[in-house]
Amino acid sequence: MAEHPAPAGTSVITSLPDVSELPELGFSGWKSWFGEAARAVLRWTPAPGLVLFFQSDIRESGEWVDKGYLVQRAAEAEGRRLLWHKVVCRRPPGTISHGRASYSHLLCFAHEPRARITHPGPDVLPDAGYKPWSKAMGVDACRLACRFLREESETKLVVDPFCGHGTALAVANHYGFDALGVELSTRKVRAAKRLVLELDV
């Protein structure tokens, strides 16, 4: 990313890979990588662009891994401001889960704080929505993120540097944004190119 500066009007919607997707790093190596990757994404996004992270906590090696905290720590290191922190339910409230949290974090960071947000959206989303694949962000979560960008930012281009099957990109296109994804897996790239979502307004 450092070799390809972001154009003006860029914002990011992404979900950083889980340790299960990078087993070669080991747990401690993944935690270090996660923090550096989050910082790189935040650093790359130009003002007044926003960065939105969608992350799900896990239990690994007997400890709870709060990815929302890891992202916020990276943002503090880069001098970014947290505009909001929403919870997206992956399972109905009251569900007992083992290994992975039944909710996800959706966090929005900016270069500068904002005194007022006109269209804040809900703090808790009852369902992430349709997922084109198992690790997808969920269409409803993507819609919430894209709606906020449309109503509260100067965004023209949405970038997902870990795009997977391209859910965030497809929803961004639906909301009128140009969208660009980065993905190392050729299989996932092919899936992203094929993805078409039928969405209402």
Give, region by region, the residue ranges found by the protein language model.
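Conserved SAM-binding loop
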Residues: 192-193
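S-adenosyl-L-methionine
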Residues: 1-3, 197-201
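Flexible mid-to-C-terminal extensions adjoining Fe-S/redox cofactors in radical SAM and related proteins
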Residues: 188-189, 201
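Core catalytic lobe of class I
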Residues: 1-182, 187
